[in-house]
């Protein structure tokens, strides 16, 4: 399971030029499910995302979590994070989980996060989305669980 975590000032998702959801200060999480992933991988990723200290404290040190700042979280399914460009110029998605497995785990992860933290929005699995964001920093971390 791969999570691309971006600290944002704001982020939004549109589908067919219609707004779906938006957040203010917080984290934009792009989530990819790989072959072999399971709920345990999801649980590890959830704990990291909610508790990683990527927000600045009063002294400017990255010392506060999403929970500490009471920020918002936007989760966007992003299977291309599981892609590889090892040979040639065309990406291979051999490591990406099949769509039905990936959707089940995406729903599990987003549901578990929503149970733990209420300020959560999410994109739609399988949809072509436009994602808008204003990075804060920029601060971006790649998590593999």
From Swiss-Prot:
Q: Name one GO cellular component term.
A: cytoplasm
Q: Which reaction does it catalyse?
A: glycyl-tRNA(Ala) + H2O = tRNA(Ala) + glycine + H(+); a D-aminoacyl-tRNA + H2O = a tRNA + a D-alpha-amino acid + H(+)
**Principal EC category:** hydrolase
Q: What is its EC number?
A: 3.1.1.96
What subcellular compartments does it reside in?
Cytoplasm
The protein's predominant localisation is cytoplasm
The short motif Gly-cisPro motif, important for rejection of L-amino acids is annotated over 137-138
Q: How does it assemble?
A: Homodimer.
Its UniProt domain note says: A Gly-cisPro motif from one monomer fits into the active site of the other monomer to allow specific chiral rejection of L-amino acids.
**What does this chain do?**
An aminoacyl-tRNA editing enzyme that deacylates mischarged D-aminoacyl-tRNAs. Also deacylates mischarged glycyl-tRNA(Ala), protecting cells against glycine mischarging by AlaRS. Acts via tRNA-based rather than protein-based catalysis; rejects L-amino acids rather than detecting D-amino acids in the active site. By recycling D-aminoacyl-tRNA to D-amino acids and free tRNA molecules, this enzyme counteracts the toxicity associated with the formation of D-aminoacyl-tRNA entities in vivo and helps enforce protein L-homochirality.
Question: Which family does the UniProt entry place this protein in?
Answer: Belongs to the DTD family.
What is the protein's given name? Answer: D-aminoacyl-tRNA deacylase
Q: Which organism is it from?
A: Methylacidiphilum infernorum (isolate V4)
Ranked from the top, the taxonomy reads: Bacteria, Pseudomonadati, Verrucomicrobiota, Methylacidiphilae, Methylacidiphilales
Gene label: dtd
């Amino acid at each position: 399971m791969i999570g691309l975590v971006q600290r944002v000032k704001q982020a939004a998702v549109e589908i067919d030029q219609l707004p779906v959801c938006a957040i203010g200060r917080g984290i934009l999480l792009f989530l990819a499910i790989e072959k072999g992933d399971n709920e345990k991988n999801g649980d590890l990723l959830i704990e990291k995302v909610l508790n990683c200290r990527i927000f600045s404290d009063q002294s400017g040190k990255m010392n506060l979590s999403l929970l500490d700042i009471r920020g918002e979280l936007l989760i966007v399914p992003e299977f291309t994070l599981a892609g590889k460009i090892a040979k040639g110029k065309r990406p291979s998605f051999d490591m990406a989980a099949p769509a039905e497995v990936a959707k089940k785990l995406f729903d599990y992860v987003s549901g578990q996060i929503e149970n733990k933290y209420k300020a959560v929005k999410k994109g739609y699995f399988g949809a072509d989305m436009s994602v808008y964001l204003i990075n804060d920093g920029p601060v971006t971390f790649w998590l593999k669980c």
